[in-house]
Amino acid sequence: MTEKSNHLNQPSSKTWSGRFNEPVAELVKQYTASVGFDYRLAEYDIQGSLAHARMLGAQGIISQDDVAQIEQGLGEIMDEIRNGEFAWLLDLEDVHLNIEKRLTDKIGDAGKRLHTGRSRNDQVATDIRLWLRSMVDDALSRLRKLQASLVALAEQHADTVMPGFTHLQVAQPVTFGHHLLAYFEMLQRDAERLVDARKRINRLPLGAAALAGTSYPIDRERVAHELGFEAVCENSLDAVSDRDFAIEFTAAAALIMTHLSRLSEELILWSSPRFGFIDIADRFCTGSSIMPQKKNPDVPELVRGKTGRVNGHLVALLTLMKSQPLAYNKDNQEDKEPLFDTVDTLLVTLEIYADMLRGIKVNKDAMRLAAAEGFATATDLADYLVKKGMPFRDAHEVVALAVRHAVEQGCDLADLSLSQLQKFSPEIAEDVYGVLTLEGSLASRNHRGGTAPAQVREALKRARALLG
């Protein structure tokens, strides 16, 4: 759908104006109108209206001639919208009444019969579900591409040694591939959450009408089948009043953004001169207006920043719903802008992130040097002593003393002589030096989920299988 046409603040009679003695104030019109943002639902609104009209015809509620006129008119309106020729009127409040008014102008009384057995309450709930279902499918597709980019980079670095961190302090050696696959696992759970949320999105509210259902002999299952819904909402009050499906999606989106924010923080650190682990492609960075040497990682910084935006939308939607009595309330008009912006932010972030990962260059030497300088094999020395029969807590104390001595000497554990090491424990023998290598440390974690290169390759196979 193209961007909305100009909003024309022209007078027009409202569908509900018969009850009132005076027109709505102009400022109130502007305050209450939603067409400035819900126009995005137009194509889905038309899809729902077409299915509703066909059902009304099949049930004998309106004539087949009316159905044919409605189909013709809505088809023409769809073309107008796609071509940017549709005039959205602020005076008509929202996407639904704008389309209905245009339809009635085109086909007369047949257009007035379209809303039979329907309310804007179940209409908008249907529109949002149709739209969000499509957006979830788009997000899943982009998420899979991002996961594929992670796997491709991890495959290149299944053996690349880097320091693993806790508290941002060097902890133990891992491989860069293993580190990247941690994010693959997070995103895999995110994908599962989206798939699961889609099941609850994919329920048809139409037929609930305003709140109590309708007295017309409608066939909700027929409409659900035509629109691709798995089932109908079972309670009319619930169908029109709750937006938990939108909140659930936004929560899933917030988790995706949070995971990408964590990775972004690491990319920012790793690309800094203090680390020098990676180089982010120039097309994802910007310079400084005053400092000629600067190369700023703007994309990961913005991902980190936009995560707060999406998290804020989640809180906004939760707060929106928390005090509403059943059934529909005008408060729910405020669900769309946070939801729309969440989708927009998520989709572009997923797309740009996949491309950014493909452009990363890795400095293997810098990674290895950082792992070698941080006593990353200290735990391996403790495990070595445990395998010699020493209780782990005693081994922990022995190695801590050895590390302190190495710090005082300005060297690593592997640089200490055998006699120096044996001062801390006579159990230490010549074979300890094989344990204190980075490769030895990695190879010893040779179990499912471990960081041994062989296990990383097995994990990569499983990841590829998940992606298909």
Swiss-Prot record:
<keyword id="KW-0456">Lyase</keyword>
<dbReference type="Pfam" id="PF14698">
    <property type="entry name" value="ASL_C2"/>
</dbReference>
<keyword id="KW-0055">Arginine biosynthesis</keyword>
<dbReference type="InterPro" id="IPR024083">
    <property type="entry name" value="Fumarase/histidase_N"/>
</dbReference>
<dbReference type="InterPro" id="IPR022761">
    <property type="entry name" value="Fumarate_lyase_N"/>
</dbReference>
<comment type="pathway">
    <text>Amino-acid biosynthesis; L-arginine biosynthesis; L-arginine from L-ornithine and carbamoyl phosphate: step 3/3.</text>
</comment>
<dbReference type="InterPro" id="IPR008948">
    <property type="entry name" value="L-Aspartase-like"/>
</dbReference>
<dbReference type="Pfam" id="PF00206">
    <property type="entry name" value="Lyase_1"/>
</dbReference>
<keyword id="KW-0028">Amino-acid biosynthesis</keyword>
<dbReference type="GO" id="GO:0005829">
    <property type="term" value="C:cytosol"/>
</dbReference>
<dbReference type="GO" id="GO:0042450">
    <property type="term" value="P:arginine biosynthetic process via ornithine"/>
</dbReference>
<dbReference type="GO" id="GO:0006526">
    <property type="term" value="P:L-arginine biosynthetic process"/>
</dbReference>
<dbReference type="InterPro" id="IPR029419">
    <property type="entry name" value="Arg_succ_lyase_C"/>
</dbReference>
<protein>
    <recommendedName>
        <fullName>Argininosuccinate lyase</fullName>
        <ecNumber>4.3.2.1</ecNumber>
    </recommendedName>
</protein>
<dbReference type="InterPro" id="IPR020557">
    <property type="entry name" value="Fumarate_lyase_CS"/>
</dbReference>
<keyword id="KW-0963">Cytoplasm</keyword>
<dbReference type="InterPro" id="IPR000362">
    <property type="entry name" value="Fumarate_lyase_fam"/>
</dbReference>
<dbReference type="InterPro" id="IPR009049">
    <property type="entry name" value="Argininosuccinate_lyase"/>
</dbReference>
<dbReference type="GO" id="GO:0004056">
    <property type="term" value="F:argininosuccinate lyase activity"/>
</dbReference>
<comment type="similarity">
    <text>Belongs to the lyase 1 family. Argininosuccinate lyase subfamily.</text>
</comment>
